[in-house]
Amino acid sequence: MSPSQSPSVAQVQIESHVFPPTVKPPGTSKPFFLGGAGERGLEIQGKFIKFTAIGVYLEDSAIPSLAVKWKGKTAEELTDSVDFFRDIVSGPFEKFTQVTMILPLTGQQYSEKVTENCVAYWKAVGTYTDAEAKAIEKFIEVFKDETFPPGGSILFTQSPLGSLTIAFSKDGSLPETGTVVMENKQLSEAVLESIIGKHGVSPAAKKSLAARMSELLKEKPEAQTAAAAE
């Protein structure tokens, strides 16, 4: 799918932050489309408090790749399918995740929570090795001195080859290059897994992804007409 054929999708607004329909992430020259977006929050004393807004962008080739198995499924079917989100996380296409602060957060707070989720997942599936332990140490180091005000963002560009490009933005703009590139496929996938996986921290982002991708994966009317004529 060439850039001129990028899928037509709408922006998503969460609180005051707008995720545009397409972006060019740090560390890649390709435009990505907005797969879905949602908040991450917690119920505190009976009130739902939103901490971050999360947008998940996908390379255009995600659509034909996912269509093989998921074309024609309803939003509900996709929302309830662990395998669907696993196929997004591990699929042979690039992904870009933007985590934008609604409330202020320190890099240490963020990295500790993410790595805790990653390690728990790896231990559960039996894939936690020395390489992952070293990657976790480096990940925590990258975030150690960072602070994120409301509107600040953490940016992850995930390559199917195994690299994870991490960048930061304090003003909503996207830098052209990353702050650091980490070469660990498990960590690269685990960051997105921790958001939209089986125990993902943003059910709202999962629901948005499922609804929007269900529409994008529907057969084109022309294809249906052709099939009916055969």
Curated annotation (Swiss-Prot):
GO terms for biological process: flavonoid biosynthetic process. The record marks Y110 as: Important for catalytic activity. SUPFAM superfamilies: Chalcone isomerase (SSF54626). It comes from the Eukaryota. The keyword Lipid biosynthesis does not apply. The keyword Ion transport does not apply. Its EC number is 5.5.1.6. It catalyses: a chalcone = a flavanone. Pathway: Secondary metabolite biosynthesis; flavonoid biosynthesis. Keywords: Flavonoid biosynthesis, Isomerase. GO terms for molecular function: chalcone isomerase activity. Substrate binds at T52, N117, S194. Belongs to the chalcone isomerase family. Part of the biosynthetic pathway for all classes of flavonoids, a large class of secondary plant metabolites, many of which are brightly colored. Catalyzes the intramolecular cyclization of bicyclic chalcones into tricyclic (S)-flavanones. Responsible for the isomerization of 4,2',4',6'-tetrahydroxychalcone (also termed chalcone) into naringenin. This is Chalcone--flavanone isomerase. It comes from Camellia sinensis (Tea plant). The lineage of its organism: Eukaryota, Viridiplantae, Streptophyta, Embryophyta, Tracheophyta.
